[in-house]
């Protein structure tokens, strides 16, 4: 026993610096081992990789939930929807029963009508053979009324009172002729008009002519 203790002492020399032994003891502490065990989740080390469900699986789950309305909480909206569906189904069944009663005779048999052996009078007339009546629109009627009004209005002739008075007509023509003879000299443009305009050059004349044309 003494020999073994001496052997252990001789094999494990004391470290006066205290750095190496403290580092080895710190690595094998129980607290660190417990922390490492806590990080292991279901046999997978941290960080964990989460396996997400595919989109099709989610849709299947949602459809199953919608198809099973027993476990769905009954809200006001859901209750109103159920009531409306029940009433619509009841109305549909009553309509079907009424149609069945109306289409059957007293013996309960249905009456079938053959469309192929209808009389000629009951068959519809083709559109090409139908007699189309002319449709007069309101605009056409208004145009006809306006034209009639224009034709009915007489045109006033202001020269009818002087038709048999040759002197009045002659004096009127002579006055016009004398007036235009007096004004003719003032209205005519002098032939050297452009030569007298010193501010207008040849280029400006060309531009002016192009604009006038």
UniProtKB/Swiss-Prot annotation:
Only expressed in organs with dividing cells. The keyword Nucleus does not apply. The keyword tRNA processing does not apply. Pfam families: Cyclin_N. Keywords: Cell cycle, Cell division, Cyclin, Mitosis. It comes from the Eukaryota. Residues 1-23 are annotated as: Disordered. Interacts with the CDC2 protein kinase to form a serine/threonine kinase holoenzyme complex also known as maturation promoting factor (MPF). The cyclin subunit imparts substrate specificity to the complex. Belongs to the cyclin family. Cyclin AB subfamily. Essential for the control of the cell cycle at the G2/M (mitosis) transition. This is G2/mitotic-specific cyclin-1. It comes from Medicago sativa (Alfalfa).
């Amino acid at each position: 026993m003494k020999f073994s203790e001496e052997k252990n002492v001789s094999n494990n020399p004391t470290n006066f610096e205290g750095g190496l032994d403290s580092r080895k003891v710190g690595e094998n502490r129980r607290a660190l081992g417990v922390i490492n065990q806590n990080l292991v989740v279901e046999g997978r080390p941290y960080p964990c990789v989460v396996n997400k469900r595919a989109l099709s699986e989610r849709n299947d789950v949602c459809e199953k939930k919608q198809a099973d309305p027993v476990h769905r909480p009954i809200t006001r909206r859901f209750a109103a929807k159920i009531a409306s569906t029940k009433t619509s189904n009841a109305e549909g069944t009553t309509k079907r029963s009424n149609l069945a009663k109306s289409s059957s005779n007293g013996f309960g048999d249905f009456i079938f009508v053959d469309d192929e052996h209808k009389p000629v009078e009951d068959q519809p007339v083709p559109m090409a053979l139908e007699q189309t009546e002319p449709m007069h629109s309101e605009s056409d009627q208004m145009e006809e009324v306006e034209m009639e009004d224009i034709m009915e209005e007489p045109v006033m002739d202001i020269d009818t009172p002087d038709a048999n008075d040759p002197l009045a007509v002659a004096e009127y023509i002579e006055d016009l002729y004398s007036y235009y003879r007096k004004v003719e000299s003032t209205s005519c443009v002098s032939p050297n008009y452009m030569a007298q305009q010193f501010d207008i050059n040849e280029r400006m004349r060309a531009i002016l002519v192009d604009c006038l044309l």
